[in-house]
């Protein structure tokens, strides 16, 4: 498997610059907010979302030369993503993410809420200054989608008749919406044909769904240390993901366990056993592969380039995280 560092080589310099710029962009006059923001962007990671924005920007520009507006869009994408994580961690009562303390565990819930709101507000300001109404419409809808996803997740906890379609819709709102919108936005800033821009929206959509589905598999198959957060955390809170939905199709014994919210001894352990013994993980892996393959097909209209190849490799890398 190619390392993510090698895959992102075409935008390595741009990502280095982005990392330096992020702390400057979210600087606040208030020392606590500044400290919280710096804490957020000090976390290590390859920042796949802005990397994809930068790769699409290069793949859609002549000679792969991108503009300052493309770079700013990549920064906005990461700021919005980070803001959503701050609020997610509060709602999930998570103390760690990527192996480091969350903002609310270090600074308290009030500061964390304000920090998340502040990041959303900052992203809106920088978004408006891109001076592209179409891009503003695309990206601003993402913030609405985040809220929609959280509402749906809250309303559907321990819902044993949740459909796969409902699960995928929630996954789109919470994960894939930002990737889809920012992918298309990068193309629009390159002034490409609308057909190509829509293809790239669908690339981001299906890649985002594949990424979320893989994450939901890893929640069952990886350790807390590997995940950087507690394993099986979604199931414990009643958030039924694809592995559980497929297991429910094959074994109805799961229904009473989930309906009583794992309140009796061994309920949770028996649920994990059923998920493992059915073909639920295998079927979920196939679902992720389907979305990844569609994502790759959406790149067909792009001209040959190293950035296009990197976009394909990212899609394959998402699946290879399972092995």
Swiss-Prot record:
Gene3D superfamilies named in the record: Farnesyl Diphosphate Synthase (1.10.600.10)
GO biological process, one term: quinone biosynthetic process
GO cellular component, as recorded: cyanelle
EC number: 2.5.1.-
Pfam families linked to this entry: polyprenyl_synt (PF00348)
Binding site for isopentenyl diphosphate: 46, 49, 81, 98
InterPro entries: Isoprenoid_synthase_dom_sf, Polyprenyl_synt, Polyprenyl_synt_CS
Binding site for Mg(2+) 2: 88, 92
Top EC class for this record: transferase
Coiled coil ranges: none
Annotated SUPFAM superfamilies: Terpenoid synthases (SSF48576)
Residues where an all-trans-polyprenyl diphosphate binds: 97, 174-175, 212
Alphabetical list of NCBIfam families matching this protein: prenyl_cyano
Family label: Belongs to the FPP/GGPP synthase family.
Protein name: Prenyl transferase
UniProt organism field: Cyanophora paradoxa
């Amino acid at each position: 498997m190619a390392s993510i560092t090698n895959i992102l080589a075409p935008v390595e310099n741009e990502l280095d610059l982005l990392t330096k710029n992020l702390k400057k962009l979210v600087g606040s006059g208030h020392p606590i907010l500044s400290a919280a923001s710096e804490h957020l962007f000090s976390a290590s990671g390859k920042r796949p979302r802005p990397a994809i924005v930068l790769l699409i920007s290069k793949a859609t520009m002549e000679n792969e030369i991108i503009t300052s507006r493309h770079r700013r869009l990549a920064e906005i994408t990461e700021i919005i993503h980070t803001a959503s994580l701050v609020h997610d961690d509060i709602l999930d009562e998570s103390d760690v993410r990527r192996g480091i303390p969350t903002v609310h565990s270090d600074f308290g819930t009030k500061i964390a809420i304000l920090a998340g709101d502040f990041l959303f507000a900052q992203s809106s300001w920088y978004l408006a200054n891109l001076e592209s109404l179409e891009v503003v419409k695309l990206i601003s809808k993402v913030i609405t989608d985040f809220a929609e996803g959280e509402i749906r997740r809250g309303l559907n906890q321990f819902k044993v008749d949740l459909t796969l379609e409902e699960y995928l819709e929630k996954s789109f709102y919470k994960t894939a919406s930002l990737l889809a919108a920012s992918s298309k936005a990068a193309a629009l800033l390159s002034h490409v044909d609308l057909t190509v821009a829509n293809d790239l929206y669908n690339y981001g959509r299906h890649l985002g769904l594949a990424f979320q589905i893989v994450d939901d598999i890893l929640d069952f198959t990886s350790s807390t240390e590997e995940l950087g957060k507690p394993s099986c955390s979604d199931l414990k809170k009643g958030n039924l993901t694809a592995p559980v939905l497929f297991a429910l199709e094959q074994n109805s014994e799961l229904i009473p366990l989930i309906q009583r919210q794992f309140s009796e001894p061994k309920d949770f352990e028996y649920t994990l056993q059923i998920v493992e013994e059915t073909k639920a993980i295998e079927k979920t892996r196939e679902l992720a592969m389907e979305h990844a393959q569609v994502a790759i097909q959406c790149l067909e209209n792009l001209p040959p380039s190293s950035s296009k190849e990197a976009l394909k490799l990212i899609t394959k890398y998402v699946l290879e995280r399972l092995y």
